[in-house]
Amino acid sequence: MAKGEVLIIDDDPDLCAAMQAALQSEGFTVRCANQGSLGLKMMRERRPDVVFLDIIMRMPTEGVWVSEEIANDPELRSVPVVMLTSIVGSEFAGHFPTDRPLHAHKFLDKPVPLNQIIEIASHFACQPASSYN
């Protein structure tokens, strides 16, 4: 029996593969999407227990858009979102929109140790979804 279901939305294939391998070795079912629209489609097909979401993908604020879509969807808004980014110190740092709220339950700077990813996934997978609203 799987510990829970994790969706990773990130355009970095190496990061996705590393996170997927680490989480699967701990008993999680893991799906990956390399762009926001695909991640939303996958969420609507089968709701995950937690989403790890990159902020900067094809567009500098694609992850912000995805988090807004999740927050505005009654079927998805209870899914915990963990935002991942390497924006600190990047060329995008000065262009990031600070006037829009980030709809995230946790915010992590890359690189994130894989053991921390596992701990976070374990925490959210064993909590009732209603406790995140």
Please place each PLM-identified region on the residue numbering.
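Two-component/phosphorelay signaling modules centered on CheY-like receiver
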Residues: 13-31
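Active-site beta3 strand of CheY-like receiver
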Residues: 46-53, 57
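Alpha4 helix (beta4-alpha4-beta5 surface) of REC/receiver domains from two-component response regulators
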Residues: 61-65, 86-109, 115, 119, ...
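Non-catalytic signal-transmission and effector/linker regions of two-component phosphorelay proteins
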Residues: 1-7, 113-133
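Helix N-cap/capping motif at the beta->alpha junctions
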Residues: 32-41, 62-63
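Short amphipathic alpha-helix used as the core "switch/output" element in two-component signaling
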Residues: 41, 64-77
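Conserved sequence signature across two-component system core domains
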Residues: 9-10, 33, 51
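His-Asp phosphorelay/catalytic-motif detector in bacterial-type signaling
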Residues: 47-49, 75-80
